């Protein structure tokens, strides 16, 4: 699969796999968690879920702008760290009160910001691996 591909492709694919694993693991049970842990209605849990997804898909526009200013690899690295800290914060049991809700909201914001810096910029880095003439004919297979 990675035969005759640029050396960095494996590391970038592994980073993307880790990010998607964290995202889909959390998102699969998120609404159920909101309902059972906080006693929220389906509507309120759905609103929080939808707002989180909106941030996940809207904020990468800003992540691209930041990458133009500081560079793609710095954005990807910083995004991974911020996402990891957000998932870690989300995993800390904090009970059911206001503090727990605040902690969860901060964690969701961190995950959204981390994803915005990571997701789109990682794809750019994969594309740049194929700028070298010896890999240009394999560009489509890298994606």
Regions found by a protein language model. Name each.
Residues 1-23, 98-100:
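Cytosolic juxtamembrane N-terminal segment immediately preceding the first transmembrane helix
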Residues 17, 86, 99-121:
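Hydrophobic core of transmembrane alpha-helices in multi-pass small-molecule transporters
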Residues 26-44, 48:
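Short amphipathic helix-loop junctions that connect adjacent transmembrane helices
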Residues 40-54, 137-143:
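Loop-to-transmembrane helix entry
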Residues 50-68, 119, 123:
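Central cavity-lining transmembrane alpha-helices of secondary-active solute carriers
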Residues 68-83, 133-138:
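Cytoplasmic membrane-interface "Motif A"-like loop-to-helix N-cap segments
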Residues 77-99, 104:
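C-terminal ends and interior cores of transmembrane alpha-helices
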Residues 117-133:
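Intracellular juxtamembrane helix-capping segments at the cytosolic ends
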């Amino acid at each position: 699969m990675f035969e005759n591909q640029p050396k960095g492709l494996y590391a970038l694919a592994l980073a993307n796999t880790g990010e998607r694993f964290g995202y889909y693991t959390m998102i699969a049970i998120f609404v159920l968690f909101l309902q059972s842990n906080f006693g929220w209605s389906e509507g309120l849990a759905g609103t929080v879920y939808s707002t989180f997804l909106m941030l996940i898909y809207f904020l990468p526009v800003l992540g691209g702008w930041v990458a133009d200013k500081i560079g793609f690899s710095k954005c990807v690295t910083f995004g991974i760290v911020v996402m990891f800290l957000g998932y870690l914060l989300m995993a800390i049991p904090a009970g059911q009160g206001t503090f727990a809700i605040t902690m969860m909201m901060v964690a969701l914001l961190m995950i959204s910001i981390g994803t915005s810096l990571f997701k789109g910029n990682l794809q750019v880095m994969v594309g740049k691996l194929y700028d070298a003439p010896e890999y240009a004919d394999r560009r489509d297979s890298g994606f």
